[in-house]
Amino acid sequence: MTDKSKDNSKSLLYCSFCGKNQKEVQKLIAGPKVYICDECIRLCNDIITEETIKQNNITDTENKINYLPKPHEIKKHLDNYVIGQNYTKKVLSVAVYNHYKRLYNFNKKTDSVELGKSNILLIGPTGSGKTLLAQTLAKLLDVPFTITDATTLTEAGYVGEDVENVIQKLLQKCKYNVKKAELGIVYIDEIDKIARKSDNPSITRDVSGEGVQQALLKLIEGTLASIPPQGGRKHPQQEFLQVNTSNILFICAGAFSELSKIVSKRLDAGTEIGFKANIKEKKQKKSEDFLLKQVEPEDLIKFGLIPEFIGRLPIITILNKLTEDALVNILCKPKNALIKQYQTLFELENVKLEFNAESIQLIAKKAMNKNTGARGLRSIIEGILLNIMYELPSMVNIEKILINESVVNSNSLPKIIYGKNKSKKASGE
């Protein structure tokens, strides 16, 4: 029995890498005086793939920086998706271009002047296009992008999200590829909601206001952050990822609804020289857009942002409140215009959807009255089209649906045009 087992072991072939015999593996591939099993082939393939991905990421990063669109090209792209806000688009185009050119300089690691990071603060009313501008930029540059609501953030140790979760969301967007995340854009919305609650220091700790600003300082400026992949509070034992935030572009945005009053007070105080000086000028009410364009860091400090936080956001740009004409253009002109979206949705049912000029003007007027900017347009159109979208899948032989001003005004049924197979009928005529 012993001799037979020795003979069997001699006849078996073994993998030259892991030492397993042919019975312990699925496949054993032979070469000149050497063998390799399927398990070792898979392992080698994984190693090569991992190295290739790393190399591709480095090359991809260099290519993105080297083939960066010029400011004119960036603005032109923004014009296709965002109506108005020309000055803000120029500011963003230059800021983003300079930011990624700075990365090229950083990667070269020359002994030249070190370029600082220029994060951005967007100030503008609800629905003026702040979020859309940032999203459009990220798509153009093909970099990871994440949106965080500042109101959900709290200081570490308190109920709410830690500020590190901002970077964790960015990592999720690029499947935890740290190198890609370090080139991303973080958009922090509602930044005005974390303003300091009072000018005077309080005994009660302001964990969702000044505390969050303090916690964000290092992250925005640039630091080596330890990020838990699955969130630190629920999984405290996990291995942390090291992410350098020095090259991440932070765009903070908010409505800053009371800021114009602070600016107005400062401007009025500056005109009070002499007895009854400039009384006529003071009585003239200045528009909110005009006042916000005069904003200074001292106004933001009075609003409740701490000086150190403002210092990390050197580029401040103001978005104008959208006019009725601008809302009309938003409905029709951009590549992803709302009316085009709903027309595409109806085309899936082989039905044409048309709005006449008067109905579009009325929709814009309704949004203006609600004071919700472009954000309110979708809810208005949803309300107008709800009944027809409910009935349409069950209807047959529909060719076209026409929306006129009476549909928008009184929510009556739209005009329905049937195909040639049936006699023409119309609802709401």
Swiss-Prot record:
Residues that coordinate or bind ATP: P125, T126, G127, S128, G129, K130, T131, L132
PROSITE patterns: CLPX_ZB
Chain's gene name: clpX
Domain ClpX-type ZB: start-end pairs: 2-56
Family indicated by similarity: Belongs to the ClpX chaperone family.
Function: ATP-dependent specificity component of the Clp protease. It directs the protease to specific substrates. Can perform chaperone functions in the absence of ClpP.
Protein name per Swiss-Prot or TrEMBL: ATP-dependent Clp protease ATP-binding subunit ClpX
Pfam family, one: AAA_2
Entries under InterPro entries matching the protein: AAA+_ATPase, ATP-dep_Clp_protease_ClpX, ATPase_AAA_core, Clp_ATPase_C, Clp_protease_ATP-bd_su_ClpX, ClpX_bact, P-loop_NTPase, Znf_CppX_C4
Chain positions recorded as Zn(2+) binding sites: C15, C18, C37, C40
Keyword terms, alphabetized: ATP-binding, Chaperone, Metal-binding, Nucleotide-binding, Zinc
GO BP: any one term: proteolysis involved in protein catabolic process
SMART domains: AAA, ClpB_D2-small, zf-C4_ClpX
Gene3D superfamilies: 1.10.8.60, ClpX chaperone, C4-type zinc finger domain, P-loop containing nucleotide triphosphate hydrolases
Annotated organism of origin: Buchnera aphidicola subsp. Acyrthosiphon pisum (strain APS) (Acyrthosiphon pisum symbiotic bacterium)
UniProt GO cellular component terms: HslUV protease complex
Source superkingdom: Bacteria
GO MF term set: ATP binding; ATP hydrolysis activity; ATP-dependent protein folding chaperone; protein dimerization activity; unfolded protein binding; zinc ion binding
Subunit and partners: Component of the ClpX-ClpP complex. Forms a hexameric ring that, in the presence of ATP, binds to fourteen ClpP subunits assembled into a disk-like structure with a central cavity, resembling the structure of eukaryotic proteasomes.
